[in-house]
């Protein structure tokens, strides 16, 4: 009896050791999932992306064939994106429409361009802490059902935010 009891406690010890390892693994997995949530890089229309205190929200998207004075190339269209930028960091930040690109459904990526203006074109500048700016950026792209706006704040930085537009 004592011998059987000893064997039983040995198995319990092994079992509880395994359970402790499983709990530790789950805790590590949960932390991994939390990190993945914090590093979200894809957003939709009216969703705010936060990259080191720079908050960007794409609030509107319009497609245009231009006006009587300016038209896109044959097979292309203008995509006019309205966005808000807000500085939630404790230092000045810079912003520039050249930090934004558009990608069409074929994977072609293009820079902003001159197009039909609505007098609210986003220029470049700086924002102090809690500063805000909004404006439009015009892109010319091959006609596409879907677009993505890509934001890369600095060319030497590998951080990128994507806004999926429908």
Q: Model segments located where?
A:
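Conserved functional micro-motifs across diverse proteins
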Residues: 2-166
């Amino acid at each position: 009896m004592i011998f059987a009891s000893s064997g039983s406690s040995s198995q319990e010890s092994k079992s509880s050791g395994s359970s402790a390892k499983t709990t530790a693994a789950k805790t590590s997995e949960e932390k991994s999932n939390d990190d993945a949530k914090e590093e979200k890089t894809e957003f939709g229309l009216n969703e705010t992306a936060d990259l080191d205190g720079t908050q960007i929200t794409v609030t509107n998207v319009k497609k245009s064939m231009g006006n009587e004075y300016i038209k896109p190339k044959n097979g292309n269209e203008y995509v006019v994106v309205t966005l808000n930028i807000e500085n939630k960091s404790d230092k000045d930040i810079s912003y520039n429409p050249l930090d934004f690109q558009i990608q069409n459904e074929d994977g072609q990526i293009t820079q902003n361009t001159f197009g039909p203006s609505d007098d609210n074109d986003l220029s470049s500048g700086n924002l102090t802490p809690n500063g805000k700016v909004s404006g439009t950026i015009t892109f010319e792209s091959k006609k596409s059902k879907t677009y993505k706006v890509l934001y890369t704040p600095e060319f030497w930085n590998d951080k990128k935010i994507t806004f999926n537009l429908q």
